[in-house]
Amino acid sequence: MAKFLKAGKVAVVVRGRYAGKKVVIVKPHDEGSKSHPFGHALVAGIERYPLKVTKKHGAKKVAKRTKIKPFIKVVNYNHLLPTRYTLDVEAFKSVVSTETFEQPSQREEAKKVVKKAFEERHQAGKNQWFFSKLRF
């Protein structure tokens, strides 16, 4: 079978706490690992999406409404619904790894890097679909 869950592929989580949230695959593990003996992927996603901004909003309100709250997680392939979209993950690929999940402080640092990368892409107006809430 062809490997289509590659790094950079956007997917939707269908089970658990982050169900309905969009994620981007950072590192796929098709064969599994010792700690997770099943096909899984390291993903970075958006827990809280940015809100709509209009012309009448001031600078302070715009800054507050464009904030993004990210998450990083190991997700089973069975719980991912892949989409046709892709996203560049080079900005945070080196920071999010299996070692990131060992220490809470490392996890927080990785989240900060992911947040910065996501906010830069959102401000630039790229990948607009990824930054909009999934309506269902």
UniProtKB/Swiss-Prot annotation:
It is found in: Cytoplasm. GO terms for molecular function: structural constituent of ribosome. Its main location: cytoplasm. GO terms for biological process: cytoplasmic translation. InterPro entries: Ribosomal_eL27, Ribosomal_eL27_CS, Ribosomal_eL27_KOW, Ribosomal_eL27_sf, Translation_prot_SH3-like_sf. Pfam families: Ribosomal_L27e. Keywords: Cytoplasm, Ribonucleoprotein, Ribosomal protein. The keyword Ribonucleoprotein applies. One of its GO terms (cellular component) is cytosol. The keyword Ribosomal protein applies. Coiled coil: none annotated. Present with 7380 molecules/cell in log phase SD medium. Component of the large ribosomal subunit (LSU). Mature yeast ribosomes consist of a small (40S) and a large (60S) subunit. The 40S small subunit contains 1 molecule of ribosomal RNA (18S rRNA) and 33 different proteins (encoded by 57 genes). The large 60S subunit contains 3 rRNA molecules (25S, 5.8S and 5S rRNA) and 46 different proteins (encoded by 81 genes). PANTHER family: 60S RIBOSOMAL PROTEIN L27. Component of the ribosome, a large ribonucleoprotein complex responsible for the synthesis of proteins in the cell. The small ribosomal subunit (SSU) binds messenger RNAs (mRNAs) and translates the encoded message by selecting cognate aminoacyl-transfer RNA (tRNA) molecules. The large subunit (LSU) contains the ribosomal catalytic site termed the peptidyl transferase center (PTC), which catalyzes the formation of peptide bonds, thereby polymerizing the amino acids delivered by tRNAs into a polypeptide chain. Belongs to the eukaryotic ribosomal protein eL27 family. This is Large ribosomal subunit protein eL27A. It comes from Saccharomyces cerevisiae (strain ATCC 204508 / S288c). The gene is RPL27A.
